[in-house]
Swiss-Prot record:
Its EC number is 2.2.1.9. GO terms for molecular function: 2-succinyl-5-enolpyruvyl-6-hydroxy-3-cyclohexene-1-carboxylic-acid synthase activity; magnesium ion binding; manganese ion binding; thiamine pyrophosphate binding. This is 2-succinyl-5-enolpyruvyl-6-hydroxy-3-cyclohexene-1-carboxylate synthase. The gene is menD. Keywords: Magnesium, Manganese, Menaquinone biosynthesis, Metal-binding, Thiamine pyrophosphate, Transferase.
């Protein structure tokens, strides 16, 4: 009887935690099978306000949660059992920490007496994520630990938190109650002991709010009208780095038009294909005319950070700025150039709505837009109308998007090709990436998380090694109920290293490229996914268009030679330099 009471107490704590998370704005919970996390798993199963996502691989599970949180702009809970199951979340937690994505890890754990003594599946879990997650260590469930203390601990840990929080939950056996009932039913039919324990939460049970609410008050001092007038008195540029779709970066274009300054944008700005900005800035900086023009800039206003283009970063670093303002949503030091500047922790909207006057040097760089358009003409000629290749596929994908679509771009070559060559277009998709740590792991799972929350047609374009890294997550693709197209650009290895100064080809082949000779048709079949292979742009465009006719996921493999993309990048760069 005492043992069963212990199992019920474990479940009660799990239900209180999950209920409080739902009240704090959690909409999704990602779960992997495991026994020690049973109180949390059963609590999630009985919680009607949470959408549950199940996956057998914790590494992919963590990245799926990352995608869900990115898309929903809300915290997402992850439930794992003890041991290496927790450790497998580490890559996703690192990415979430660097990009301010709120993940809540609920890890089941052995009780203290079973730690560091040779007990099965027991590791030291507290602080396992080091600096990459805020840590909360809960004791084993006990009537001596007040229920309101449990909830207030959760509330405090998550207050104003935009990065991962790890809540380690120790449980003694038994873990399985005789029946699973809802928290409301527990309250209604509770024994005298349980009723006494829950009494401090009577008011909490009568509403849907968290026990403790923390108000977030912004006290940042934004520039005054006089300060704005001084800042815009001269030739300036606006540079836009990584922004989320909900940041509404179109406001920046309107601000630029008001000031009369050009806008240089990164692939992750949500503005890369906008006709009113300088999207081809990476290549434009190779052009002597454009460089001469941009060197005249005295002032710079930067939104976001984490730029992909090294040339753009070098331009920012080498200029002697009279005034340098940097706007970031969070307090990150997004400052790899280490220049003297003014940092403003504020939203895009807050800055764009300031009473900006028109610049005294408005329209000083009007020549940049025609130069940007001339590069677009070059790319049509040298990419779209030539030999089948990686950049051609990336441009075809970008052109096929609408503002109702999601485009997730993988790391290594795909994101760089999009940054360098994405076409100018009037309708552009919501862009998602994993560029905090810029790893090639977890991309399929993250994209599945984004798609699951948004329920919109989605494309993921990635390289072959990235796909091999996250192969297990093809199982998540099978769960998609909207058009989802995975485009694998297979150049047989890590051929981004063709662009780097490895001393000789033997070293490049043996230690960097790692050619594998694999194709993905049987892998797609293993997971029951529709599969097409494309060896020319006509077959690719047909397969890509047809894939969106079905409310499920499909795979298109694009086979290209190992040196095609690097050779083309070199060729185009030389042409731009000479004209």
């Amino acid at each position: 009887m005492q043992q069963q009471t212990s199992a019920d107490m474990n479940l009660l704590w799990g239900q209180l935690i999950l209920e409080e998370l739902a009240r704090l704005g959690v909409k999704h919970v990602c779960m992997a099978p495991g026994s020690r996390s049973t109180p949390l798993t059963l609590a999630a199963a009985s919680q009607t306000q949470l959408t549950r996502h199940i996956h057998f691989d914790e590494r992919g599970l963590g990245f799926m949660a990352l995608g869900l949180a990115k898309a929903s702009n809300a915290p997402v809970a992850i439930i794992t059992t003890s041991g290496t199951a927790v450790a497998n979340l580490y890559p996703a937690i690192v990415e979430a920490w660097l990009t301010h994505v709120p993940l809540i890890i609920l890890s089941g754990d052995r009780p203290p007496e079973l730690i560091d003594c040779g007990a099965n599946q027991a590791i030291i879990q507290p602080a396992i994520f080091a600096q990459y997650a805020k840590q909360v260590n809960l004791p084993t469930p006990d009537l001596g630990y007040p229920a309101n203390a449990l909830l207030s601990t959760i509330d405090h840990a998550l207050a104003n938190q935009h990065q991962p929080v790890h809540i380690n939950c120790m449980y003694r056996e038994p873990l399985y109650p005789t029946e699973l009932v809802t928290l409301a039913h527990v309250k209604k039919t509770a024994s005298v002991t349980t009723s006494t324990y829950l009494a401090p939460l009577n008011q909490w049970f009568e509403n849907t709010k968290p026990l403790t609410r923390y108000a977030s008050l912004t006290s940042a001092e934004l520039p005054t009208t006089d300060t704005l007038m001084r800042f815009v008195h001269g030739k300036g540029v606006i540079v836009v780095g990584t922004l989320a779709p909900e940041d509404n970066p179109q406001q920046i274009v309107a601000l630029a038009q008001k000031l009369g300054w050009p806008v240089l944008v990164d692939a992750q700005s949500q503005l890369r294909q906008h006709p009113g900005v300088i999207g081809h800035v990476d290549q434009l900086l190779l052009n002597p005319k454009a460089n001469k023009q941009l060197e005249q800039a005295e002032r710079i206003l930067v939104f976001g950070g984490r730029f992909i283009s090294k040339r753009l970063l070098q331009y920012i670093a080498q200029q002697s700025w009279h005034s340098y303002w940097h706007v970031v949503k969070h307090g990150d030091r997004l400052d790899p150039t280490h220049q003297s500047k003014e940092f403003y922790q504020a939203s895009v909207q807050a800055v764009c709505q300031l009473p900006w006057p028109r610049s005294s040097q408005a329209n000083w760089a009007l020549q940049l837009l025609p130069l940007n358009e001339s590069l677009e003409s070059l790319f049509k000629q040298q990419i779209d109308n030539t030999t089948f290749g990686e950049a051609q596929v990336v441009r075809a994908i970008a052109l096929a998007q609408s503002d109702q679509h999601i485009l997730f771009i993988g790391n290594s070559l795909p994101i760089r090709l999009y940054d360098m060559y994405a076409p100018i277009a009037t309708n552009t998709p919501a862009i998602y990436t994993n560029r905090g740590a810029s790893g090639i792991d977890g991309l399929i799972a993250t994209a599945c998380g984004v798609a699951a929350d948004k329920n919109a047609p989605t494309t993921l374009v990635m390289g072959d090694l990235s796909c091999l890294h996250d192969f297990n997550s093809l199982a998540l693709l099978k769960q998609m109920t909207q058009p989802f197209v995975l485009v694998i650009i297979n150049n047989d290895g890590g051929n981004i290293f063709n662009l780097l100064p490895v001393p000789n080809e033997s070293l490049r082949n043996d230690f960097y490229r790692l050619s594998h000779g694999l194709e993905f048709g049987y892998g797609a079949a293993m997971f029951g996914l529709a599969y097409r292979q494309a060896d020319d742009i006509e077959s690719f465009n047909q397969a890509y268009q047809e894939a969106f006719e079905f409310n499920c996921a499909s795979v298109i493999e694009v086979n290209v030679s190992p040196t095609q993309a690097s050779d083309q990048i070199t060729q185009i760069s030389q042409w731009v330099k000479q004209h």
